Structure formats: C-alpha cells, structure tokens
Amino acid sequence: MSQIILDNISQNETVYNRFVIIHGRVGPRASYCPQTINVKHHENSFPEQTWVVTDLYFKAIIHVVPGDNTILFTTDDGGKLELQVYYQLLVDNPFYCIAFIVGKDSDLSFDAPHGAKNDIDEGIRKLRCAAYLWQAFTAECMYRNGYGRRSFRIEESVQPDTMSCLSPWGTERLTATINILRSDKTAEEIRSVPPDQLFHIAGDAVDKLHLPEPWHYMCMFLDTRYDPSTQKIRGHVALGGGTDMHKLGVFGSHSLHSFPSALEYVVPVFSDARRIPSYLANDANESSTIWECANIGIGAMLHELGHTLGCPHQPDGIMLRSYPIFNRSFTTREFECVRTGSKGLAPVLAKDECSWHHLDMLRFFYHPCFKLPSDPTYPSDIETNYFVKGETITFVNSTGIFLIEIEYNGQTKGWKEFNPPVGEASLTDAEIRSLSNASSNQDYRVRVLSRNFKCIDLNNVPEIIKNAKVESSFGTVYRSERYGLRGCNGKELSNILIAPEKFKPTKIRVHCGLALDGIEVFFGDESVLLGNRGGSPHDFEIQGSQIVGFQIRCGAWVDGISIVLENGKTSPFYGNANGGGLKSYLVPKGFQLVGFYGTLGPFMDSIGFFIK
C-alpha cells in the first residue's frame, strides 16, 4: 500500500476559492509505483477525478463546496488519505466579472480547428475553466510565498455547471458566471478598428450595464479572427487597466480553441503536443502546439488581469511574460516544446513553475479583492501625500506605506519594501537612483503604495524636489503638490506668502458657487485674497487654532474645499461637495502653513499650499 503525502496543504485548513491545487507524493511499495491518484470529493458533490503520478510526484485540482469538506485520495494499490478542508466564501469582497464581447450581428463562433466545437456554449465552458485556473494558480502562488490562501473572487451564481464533463447535463452548482455583452459594433467593425479602440468598445459595452461601482471586468472578444493571408489577428488587443472605479482587461479569442473546457481536460490540454494548423493564429510565434497555445492564451489574459489589479511590468513572473510555462502549475510532465526546442521535462516540480513576481503578491496582499476575514480594515479616504525638505521627498499615509517602486523603460527596476509598513517614507534622488541602477540622466517614475491601497505615481522626482523650493523674504519655503488639473487654462496667481510668526488667521472666507472662486484669509480687519470674490462668501472662524490641513474636491478644476484645524474642528465643504475626486492635504509634522498658490480661469482650476 502506497503512502500519500500532501506537500502544500495541512489538515483542517481554510480555503477561499472553489478549486485548489494540491501538490503531493506517493511513497513506493517495494518495486511498485502508482501511475495515477484518484480524488473523491465531498459527498460526491463533484465527479471523481484521476491525476497522473510522475516519478512519485502528482498535482491535483480538488473541488470544494462551502463549509466542511472531506476529500479522499486513493491509489490503485490501496493507498488512502482523507483531507479535511473548510471552504469559506468571501461574499463581501469585490468580484471579477468574466465576459464575452460580441458584435451586434455576431454568429457567436470563434476560430477553431476544422470539425472542433466552436459555438458560444463551448466558448463559455472554456473561458469559465480558464478563469478558475487563474484563480487557483494565484491562490497557490500566494500561499507558497507566505501570504495565505488568498486570490481574487470571481462572479458566481447557481446555474448549470460545466466544470466537469462527467456531470449529468444540467447539474447545477455555484459556478462562474460568463456574461455575454452585445456591442453596438458589428463583428466586422470589431475586426477592422485599430486595436487600441477595442478597449473602449469593451468599456462601452460594460458601461451600458450601469453597474454599481467599483467594477472589475475581464472581457474576451468572441469575434476575433485570424487572417492567414496577412498573418494578422483581427479583433484582438491585449490590454488591462482602468480607473479607481472601473477596472477592465480585454483580449481576443484566437487561442480559445486550445483552452480546456472542463477539469478533466486540464492535463490533456497541457500535454497535447499536436501542431496548430496554419489557418489558426500562432500568437507571438509561441503557440505552435496545443499546449503552448493554451499557455499563451490563458497566461497572457492573466497578465492583463494583473494590470487591472495595478501590477506594472516586473523583472520576472507573469508580468514579464513567464506564462509560456503556465502549464507547469498543473502538470508533472512537460512535452515537446517547439518554442524552446526542448524534448520535455519530468517531473515538473514547484521550482520549475512560473509565478507572480514578489511585488505583485505583496500588492495583492493589501488589495481589496484579496481581503480575508481576519484582515484589518483601513480607512479608504486617507490619501498619500508628499512633501519636500531639502533634497528629500517624504511620502505620508497614516495607514502605512508598504512599497515604493521605481520604474523606467516600461518596467520596475527597483523598489523599497517596508515591513512593517510605515507612516512616512523618505528618499532622495540619489537613493532612488541607487535602488534602481538608474543613470544620472535617466528619467524614472516612482509609485507609492499604502495599506488602504491608495497609490500615487510621480514622474520626474528631481524636478518636483527642485520646484518645491521657493525663496521668500523669510527664507526657504516648500510648495505642496498642486490640486486641480488646470482644465480651464487658468492663469497663475500671485503667491500668498506670510511669515510664520505672522500667519495667525482669525477666519477664512471661501468664495464659491459650484466651484471654488477664491480663498480670503483674514488677520483681524485685514485680509489677503487668492482668486476672486465670485459666487457666495462663506466664513469659517479659526478661533485661535491653527490650520493643519484641507480636504479638496478637484478634477479639471477645484470643485470645493474644507478646512481642517488643529483642535479637530473641520469646516463644511464649500463649493460642490460631490464634484471631482476627494483629495486631502495635511501639513507635515514640524511644518507650518504659510501661504497659498494657484491658478484662476472662470473659477480656480488649481490650488496648492506653502509650508515652512
């Protein structure tokens, strides 16, 4: 009787997604080594599965149902192991919707080898299976690297499930929903527009649903077609990104034919070394066989999902295109590879697999889509601010900054982690260049992430440091970042600068309608004005306290502003309290507010602050 050993899970663990990758070994009995291992699921909630054993190693994907599960592993020589595992649904987390975008006249088919199924029902089966592979792969990467069994959530509902070809037709389970979104464009229009317009076509199709915000969508264009005469894939683009409220990834269906359509087909597909016919796309010239094509299609779409989660291009991993070996996360044997000329690999161990980069997983650890019930909650309204002193730029977020990334040439080149996260993180230009090996004339971008998942990107930090310094009659003062995008082409106003010992305002008068017209600072009977006196005046008494910050509503212009005092008192929002995006500025510790700057068109389209 062979002994069964599970390497990546223990008894009575809690998991948070429907399918879980299991790594294990079987101990040989004398000269006999089992060739397969069988998995029986809890109370026959899912058909029994058989997985290959290679040189004593196996990988299996188990199915779990909400609550307690008993999973039985057996070998053909009587080896047996029962695994107890608890599946907790994360019903409060944001979820990813998976969808096909189809033309308004689409025939609802996709490119496939002659004679193969290629209707919308088969497409749904394949895309559903790919989504669960993304989720299980991510959860295993996170667990393996010490971040817990966490992954992004997929939109699911009780409906006929297709994740096993052995289930009776119509068997209902809680399974991934694959949405079908009709575009206003015809199929031929989708195939004819410049590729970058496909992102907007998909976004328009999602926008028509009028979904609650934020939303997360991964979309595949079903009407993608490969043209052998031009060797072009029409109706395909690989893009992912969006705004804080709208996250969108898009991809074409040119490799969908190679995807597994059920759990029983995962290993066969990733073991299928048959050549792709010349009338089908060979994406990136890395899709010559069925298994290589599946890697590129499933993996590249996961790469775009990574962009929607905020991941930039990384030094290695999924975000550098390590997905041509995506198959290795689910198989113990790799077959002939046209891309590399390799004749195969066996056994395929965990060390041979692709993964998310360490920085991606660190980002996921704090991402709202990956939140576990035991995770603390951080206030979402706290912004990351920065200030300059001397040659140093300091980033501030009271929830804790956990990562600063430095990017140039389209890729992360250096970073600094903070474990535990810190409320303030300071760097000089020289330190940034040292961390990223950037030359003295290399432009770079700095990205700062905090535990409440606020992210700011700054280009050209040396210029920010240089321009922040302003010489006044009472010495060097420092300029804050500018709030408002100068969308009205406003003219620069004269700076208001008042020596610290004299900056003791008695009240602030805000002039506004549905946007900020001006701020008037009173010192007894005297006042200074930034902007103009349009709109209506609104007075806020300071009463011997100090101004320590502002809440600003802004976008193309400054919609409104609120004043924060040292004694804890906060003014109402003056202007449009619902306009633009909410930003906050707090005077750093050890500094004092000494003035204002900004620009004025029909109303103020930017504002900033001076500190000393």
Swiss-Prot record:
Binds 1 zinc ion. It is an enzyme of class 3 (hydrolase). Its cofactor is Zn(2+). Zn(2+) binds at H303, H307, H313. Its EC number is 3.4.24.-. Pfam families: Metallopep. Belongs to the peptidase M10B family. This is Putative zinc metalloproteinase C607.06c.
